[in-house]
Amino acid sequence: MAFGEVHIPFWEESEHIRRTCSVTGLYFWTRDKNRKTSGDTHEDPYTFIGSPIIDGFPMRGKELKDSMRSSFLDYFSENSHSKVDPYPVIARWRDDIHLTIASIADFQPHVTSGRVPPPANPLCISQPCIRLTDVAAVGRSGRHLTTFEMMAHHAFNRPNDGEIVYWIDQCVRFCDDMLVNTFGINPIEITYVENPWSGGGNAGAALEVIVGGLELATLVFMNLEEHEDGDIIIKGLTYREMDLQIIDTGYGLERFCWAAAGTPTIYEAIYPESVSWLKE
């Protein structure tokens, strides 16, 4: 499934245009008719440092994270999603990973395969995650963490059975509406970059949501499963279409906090006491 083949009415209604990034060659959607890059390249600086792009969050540290998390979950709760408690960070229901690395990992493989129903449908969650693959980048990039929370909204569709909760168009509408009307982000600053996603045996078309040079979220439209007889190749692996169509999103809690704080790095926004202690 390619975005060029999928009709998304929201793009037309909101006057988005599809462009090709002059740096990466990836397609992206924007309201800015003069934009030439996707927003996530070496030519795109962080524009929010010293000038926050999310308003209304003057606090720092735990208070900031708690407030940001509540705003996200409340938005989706008010839009017919059930709040689900986070899963453990030790992925004891998985035999392929030890740690919970994303919110969708909570539901792989049992729910995503269709063998087990989801705890709610649609649902929203803020899942603590641990990613040791990012250790080398911590402290160098100013944005990487090994422990973080992935805020998310998920929906599990069974189109063959006529069970559709919502799919691509509504997912993008939720994301854009929340960014603009809940967090006060200037809509012309938002870009949606087309870049397929894969992980945990599943894959699908995806949109990376970029604001101010920072990737705030990824919207994945999961409709593929890894299979040796598959005829779709993504990142060197073969996939085939599966019965479920799954909305798999991930919004970085700490990155939202950083965009709201406008501090030099993400660490001053979420660990102000630790940074102050280290500076002493």
Where does each model-flagged region fall?
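Short glycine-aromatic motifs
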Residues: 16, 46-48, 80-82
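Structured aminoacyl-transfer and RNA-binding surfaces used for tRNA recognition/handling
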Residues: 52-280
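Residues immediately within or flanking Cys/His clusters that coordinate Zn2+
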Residues: 18-19, 25, 32-37
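Cysteine-rich micro-motifs
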Residues: 31-49
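Residue-level marker of regulatory loop/turn positions in helix-turn-helix DNA-binding domains and
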Residues: 13, 30
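Short, intrinsically disordered terminal segments enriched in charged and Pro/Gly residues
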Residues: 1-12
